Amino acid sequence: MITNIVITGCSTGIGIETAKYLKERMITVYPTAREQEDVNKLIELGFENALLLDVTKPETIANVIEKVLQKDGKIDVWFNNSGYGQMGAVEDIPTDVLREQFETNVFGLYEATTQVLKVFKKQGYGKLIQHSSVLGLVALPFRGAYNASKYAVEGLTDTLRLEFANTNIYPILLNTGPIKSDFRKNAIESLDKIDTENSDYKQKYQEAKSGNSKKVPFSLEADAVASIVHKIILAKKPAPRYYITKATYILGYAKRVLSTTLLDKLLLKV
C-alpha cells in the first residue's frame, strides 16, 4: 500500500518543495495551507489532495484528519512544518507578540500532534515529524521568541519519544539550519510587530530591513529537508533526530563540547 503524508505549512518554501519532492517519488501527499488561495494554488500545481489547515484553528486540523481517513483509512506520516520566526531583542518583544509566536510554533503544533496521535494509537503505528531548528539547539541574539518556541518543541518531542518508547509510533525532530526560502524575508517583516524606532537596537533593525545584515553561510536548497523527510518515510525505524545543513552540525557539536562561556563567544560571532 502506498505511503501517505500530511504536511502543514505548504504555501511556500520547505513545505511546498517537500510536497513536490515526495509526490515525484510516488508518496501520496496531503499538502495543507492556512489560506484558501494557497490551497487553490496547490491544486493548480497538481496536488488534488491539498487541504485547508490553520494550526491555530483546531477544527481545521480535525477536518483534515477526517478527510484523509475517509480517503485512505490511515495516516502514515504527519509533518508539522508550519511556523515562522519572530525577530527582535527579547526586551523589545511585547507579550502579545511572543504569545502569537507560540500560538503557531508551539500550541498549533501541539494541537496537531495530540490530534494525530489518537489516530496513530488506534492504528498502532505512525511517524510524527516535528520541524524544529538549529535554534532549538542553540540561541542567537534577536531570535529570542523563535528560540523559545523551538526549545519548547524540543522538550515536547523529547518527552513524547520517551512516552512512546517500544512502540511503532516515532516522534522525530528535524534540526534545520539556513535554507533558501522566504523564511528569512518573513522574519524581517515580523519586525513590523515591534517598536523598532524607540529601541536601543534601532540601527541593527534598520540593517536587517535594508538587507545589509550578515549573509547566512552554509545555506541549502529546500530539497535538503525534503530528502530527509523521504528518508524518514522509507526507514523502518527512523532516527529520533536529524541535523540538516552544516551549520546545524557545527553548532550542535559545539554545544556538546564547549563550555557555556565559550559557546556564547562563538554564537556572538555567528
Identify the role of each PLM range:
Residues 11-12:
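Conserved glycine-rich cofactor-binding loop
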Residues 89-90, 97-99:
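Substrate-binding pocket helix/loop in short-chain dehydrogenase/reductase
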Residues 53-63, 95:
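The beta1-alpha1 cofactor-binding region of Rossmann-like NAD(H)/NADP(H)-dependent oxidoreductases
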Residues 113, 149-152:
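Active-site helix of classical SDR
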Residues 113-114, 158:
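A short, exposed helix-loop element centered on a Lys and neighboring polar residues
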Residues 165-215:
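C-terminal beta-strand-loop-alpha-helix "lid" module of Rossmann-like NAD(P)-dependent dehydrogenases
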Residues 133:
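Residue(s) in the substrate-gating loop at a strand-loop-helix junction
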